[in-house]
Amino acid sequence: MLVFHDPLRQTDLPRGCVATIGNFDGMHVGHQQIVRGVVERARELGRPSAVITFHPHPLTVVAPDRVPKQILTLAQKEELLRDMGVDAMLVVPFSHEFSRWTADRFIEEFLVGALQVQEVRIGRDFCFGAGREGNLQKLTAAGERHGFGVMGIEDVKIRGMRVSSSIVRDALSKGCLRIVTLFLGRTFFVDGRVATGRRLGRKMGFPTVNVDPSNELYPEGGVFVTTCRFESFDRSFESVTNIGVRPTLYENYARTIEAHILDFDSN
């Protein structure tokens, strides 16, 4: 998969692509339905498939007091899209300047001018452009003028609930991992670096791995059955992970992620 980190300025873009547009935070089952449809349609037409997303989250610029914590890092989003067979990920830098682009300008200059899109698929409630003026209706009208197809994708519902990133965020922060797993369609994961701790667990006979997480959002606290993977090993390890205050070190109230790896004695 090709990744373009400044597609508004780059010229070697996947022209004639079948594309989708969105933030895709969490890459939940609703997002996956859209992306799979894009990949399948692109293969039918012999065209490249492309996911157009924004970084940082648009609210970081237009309403920083309302920006939500992100479920995925940009690198995690890239990994998931690559695994789904997407040909190109276009990461539009969301700046104050870009926030003033009208929906018409985005369509005319980027989708039509730069990408020459063959087809665009979006969620039915997706909005874009300054003031969120762009929507499915506007995009459909532009497609009729410029000759590209547009499809609005219905929401996915599970147990009568509309799948959304906001519900996943709420469930994740509360540690409701059954809902998180159901809505994500996969196990939630955290990336990070192993941090040097105080080694007190090792001295007491149950060494732990302290994780400095890359993720902004993860359960606020609890003990979880987990699996750990390390870049230096070609296998996974069963583990028990505590998130929150170190349970035996009450003088230190820093929030931590500590994993006790079962049957593991390496450093």
Regions from the language model: what does each represent?
Residues 97-207:
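Classical nucleotidyltransferase
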Residues 197-267:
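Phosphate/ribose-recognition catalytic cores of enzymes acting on nucleotide-derived substrates
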Residues 28, 81, 120, 180, ...:
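Residue-level signal for inorganic ion chemistry
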Residues 73-90:
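A glycine-rich helix N-cap at a beta->alpha junction
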Residues 69-77, 101-107:
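Glycine-rich, highly charged phosphate/nucleotide-binding loops
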Residues 10-73:
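N-terminal catalytic cores of NTP/NDP-binding nucleotidyl/phosphoryl-transfer enzymes
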Residues 2-9, 69, 90:
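Short acidic-hydrophobic, aromatic-tinged amphipathic segments that line or gate anion-handling sites
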